């Protein structure tokens, strides 16, 4: 399966509390085999699943069993520890979407396991259709609670449309382009590129530079001032956090629970690098 990691980047670790963005597909599952991710752990983060096409079966150690479909949010909170599996369904022919992570702040990074499913209604504005899965935009507010102020929305722009959105000036924003190209302010973004806008903007103008519709995902949030370490499926504050999480998973600790109903073994953790993984944050703010 074709996967493009757009966050973190060398120049930027986080956008708000968004710390990870994988953009995958579109893939013909008859050729690629689709998605079959065995049970694996998470800690210190929330996962956000958002599909453009296809269908994924989600199971987790909380006991959740849910289908992820286009236009539907699945938000899973790892906190101290959770495990889950992800498998594309037999009905899926084309698999296409984004997998996003949100770093939990220190005060809540050991939050209890949780799973939320939400189907946002599409909002029509001049030149675009908006689906707000987290936060608020275009007059719509997601009911899904987050641990830090966040925005997550799919925006589909009509051909050659220019749309000016009112946004929270205390947020920084990232625009992931799925189809385009799309211009955000003065920056032209091609498909699979992620653009960045700093705090201080109360509007963002998006312009579809193509003759077809353009799909984008707008992410935002207040700057996340904590430094984090991120390795495999874990987020911590220092290397020791990663070592302990890995040991707990390898030892089948109750920390991550067990996923029922998956046909197969769980994923073993890879070996840690020989070097100490140092905490990372964004460049100093000007």
Predicted regions and their residues:
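Jelly-roll (double-stranded beta-helix
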Residues: 1-286
């Amino acid at each position: 399966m074709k996967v493009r990691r757009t966050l973190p980047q060398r120049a930027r670790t986080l956008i708000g509390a968004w710390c990870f963005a994988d953009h995958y597909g579109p893939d013909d599952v008859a050729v690629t085999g689709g998605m079959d991710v065995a049970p694996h752990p998470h800690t210190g983060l929330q996962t956000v699943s958002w599909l453009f096409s296809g269908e994924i079966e989600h199971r987790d150690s909380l006991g959740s069993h849910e289908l992820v479909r286009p236009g539907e949010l699945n938000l899973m909170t790892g906190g101290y520890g959770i495990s889950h599996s992800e498998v594309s369904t037999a009905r899926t022919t084309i698999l296409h979407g984004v997998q996003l992570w949100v770093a939990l702040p220190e005060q809540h990074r050991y939050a209890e396991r949780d799973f939320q499913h939400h189907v946002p209604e599409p909002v029509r504005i001049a030149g675009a259709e908006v689906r707000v899965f987290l936060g608020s935009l275009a007059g719509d507010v997601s009911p899904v609670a987050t641990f830090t102020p966040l925005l997550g929305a799919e925006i589909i722009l009509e051909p050659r449309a220019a749309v000016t959105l009112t946004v929270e000036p205390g947020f920084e924003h990232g625009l992931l382009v799925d189809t385009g190209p799309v211009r955000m302010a003065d920056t032209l973004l091609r498909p699979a590129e992620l653009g960045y806008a700093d705090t201080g903007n109360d509007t963002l103008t998006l312009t579809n530079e193509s003759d077809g519709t353009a799909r984008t995902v707008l992410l935002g949030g207040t700057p996340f001032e904590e430094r984090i370490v991120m390795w495999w499926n874990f987020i911590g504050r220092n290397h020791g956090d990663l070592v302990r999480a890995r040991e707990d998973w390898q030892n089948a600790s109750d920390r991550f629970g067990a996923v029922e109903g998956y046909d197969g073994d769980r994923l073993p953790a890879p070996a840690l690098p020989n070097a100490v993984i140092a905490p990372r944050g964004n460049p100093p703010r000007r």
